[in-house]
Amino acid sequence: MGLHPDGDAPHAAATTLPMSSPAKPLPSTRVWRDWRLLTLATGMALGLFAQIGLLAHLFSLLVPALDAQLAGFAAGGATASAILGRTLVGWLMPARADRRLFGCANYAVQILGSLAFLFAAGDNIPLLLLGVVLFGAGIGNTTSLPPMIAQAEFSQEDVSRVVPLIVAVGQGTYAFAPAVFGLIRELAPRWGSASAGAAPWLFLAAALIQILAVVAFFIGRPRKA
């Protein structure tokens, strides 16, 4: 608004960081062939696919061990964990940090959550709750970090194209996640006398998909000159 605090010089220049990368804009025909976009869209889509697929079945997998009421509170705890995870990234990520590495770390935390669910075997309550906290911590960052990565890697003109593209790819991909994870849950063989809440193949699938998402983010890191 052009206003300044009392005592400041009226024309004092504010120090600001650029909102996007100084990279040159890409021709419209080359956007989909850009390695950064391909790896960013792939990493986001895979991460969302694993996340939505697992979350769609999480409540029903918690019920056998926690009962419906406590399972509802636990599922709500994932949302609280998501808020905390997003806040921590906001505090810890420097303005000029390699945001892809933070995206990789975010998926790594969720992978640990999937493994906690796996080793809980459907009835180890402390591990189930640990899984909720770890997996939930990445929920918000999975959607917020990819646009921030695009902002750091693409020119201002390209950001307005890249962000809608990666979001559309992610949405089109994760729309099928609940059904695919449901098929895994129903058709995969059971492990011995596992409890009703055990779904080892589902949690393994989530972890493996997110490992692929980590790889996609990592190999797309811009090369330093």
Sequence positions of predicted segments:
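Juxtamembrane intracellular "pre-TM" segments in multi-pass secondary transporters
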Residues: 10-37
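Hydrophobic core of transmembrane alpha-helices in multi-pass small-molecule transporters
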Residues: 45, 127-141
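Structural signature of the two symmetry-related core transmembrane helices
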Residues: 101-116
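A late C-terminal transmembrane helix in Major Facilitator Superfamily
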Residues: 139, 153-190
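A membrane-interface helix-boundary motif in multi-pass transporters
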Residues: 183-209
